[in-house]
């Protein structure tokens, strides 16, 4: 798969841009501030529907413009594909695939696939667990686009269940019929959260298992470190003790329900959901020690490019 053309309208510093590309290596060169990173960011956005530099879309639209348009012509095993995204800050983005409007932005995922290595990727080692979860989910969606819908479903249920926990906590200790009603409502949301979370959890665990040997081999090739000082990755799920689990979806759903029941009192006290994929961690270790706390700055870079 490779790009044959990239066209931008009002994206970042570019009022209009159209460049022809081809197979093989393409290098963008020029003085600082000329927009080289903006080109890479645009390609990444077309592939993932997100920027590696900012969390919202507003900075992506050129100052004074209402919207930005990104287009990429892609050649791959399935032939030629035209991917188009219209970025509308504050409104729904619009996407087209081969000029046909798609009902949801995520419907274009998989049409263009990329691997990015940027300074921001150091957060994969040094950043918060949320950065590593986001990386896992982006990679999961890139390999199997259906996970975009599964992740969206889980996040929707999580928001609604969290709102219920906060509401219940603000009412103090309920009694009688009110308590029974709240318990029944929480039971229903627990079931929905487990049903939505189990497939996402299973996908993440399978992905980590598939990545593990490649990460170890890539780290050794990049670092040139002493024998035995390898990089390992593992997935720590909040719904299990001692990381003893199976990655079949029905079993994970049961495990989530059990874990949710075990922390319900604490969740009501704190008004937050304490277990589930949103609380899990992708752990990286170098030489048997956590990379986040023990690796030097230079060592922290080695596991980062190895993900490609």
What are these regions (language model features)?
Residues 32, 50, 140-143, 147, ...:
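Flexible interhelical turns and helix-capping residues at alpha-helix boundaries
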Residues 106-111, 119-195:
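A conserved P-loop NTPase coupling/switch region
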Residues 1-31, 45, 174-308:
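Conserved NTPase motor "head" modules and their coupling/switch loops across ABC/AAA+ ATPases, GTPases
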Residues 36:
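Conserved lysine of the Walker
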Residues 44-147, 209, 213-220, 252-265:
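Nucleotide-state sensing region of NTPase/ATPase domains
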């Amino acid at each position: 798969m490779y790009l044959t053309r990239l066209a931008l309208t009002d994206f970042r510093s570019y009022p209009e841009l159209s460049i022809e590309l081809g197979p093989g290596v393409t290098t963008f060169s020029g003085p600082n501030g000329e927009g080289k990173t903006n080109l890479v960011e645009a390609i990444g956005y077309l592939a993932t529907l997100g920027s590696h530099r900012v969390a919202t879309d507003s900075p992506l639209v050129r100052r004074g413009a209402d919207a930005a348009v990104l287009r990429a012509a892609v050649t791959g095993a399935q032939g030629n594909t035209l991917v188009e995204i219209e970025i509308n800050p504050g409104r729904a983005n619009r996407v087209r695939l081969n000029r046909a409007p798609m009902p949801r932005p995520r419907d274009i995922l998989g049409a263009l696939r990329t691997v990015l290595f940027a300074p921001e990727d150091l957060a994969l080692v040094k950043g918060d667990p949320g950065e590593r979860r986001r990386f896992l989910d982006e990679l999961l969606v890139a390999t199997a686009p259906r996970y975009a819908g599964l992740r969206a479903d889980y996040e929707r249920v999580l928001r609604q269940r969290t709102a219920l926990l906060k509401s219940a906590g603000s009412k103090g200790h309920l009694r009688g019929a009110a308590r029974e009603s709240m318990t029944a409502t929480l039971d229903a949301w627990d079931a929905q959260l487990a049903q939505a979370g189990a497939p996402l959890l299973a996908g993440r665990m399978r992905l980590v298992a598939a990545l593990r040997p490649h990460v170890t081999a890539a780290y050794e090739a990049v670092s040139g470190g002493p024998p035995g000082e390898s990089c390992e990755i593992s997935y720590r799920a909040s719904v299990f003790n001692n990381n003893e689990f199976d990655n079949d979806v029905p079993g994970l759903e049961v495990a989530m329900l059990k874990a949710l029941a075990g922390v319900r009192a604490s969740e009501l006290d704190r008004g937050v959901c304490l277990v589930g994929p949103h609380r899990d961690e992708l752990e990286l270790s170098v030489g048997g020690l956590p990379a986040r706390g023990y690796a030097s700055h230079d060592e922290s870079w080695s596991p980062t490019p190895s993900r490609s």
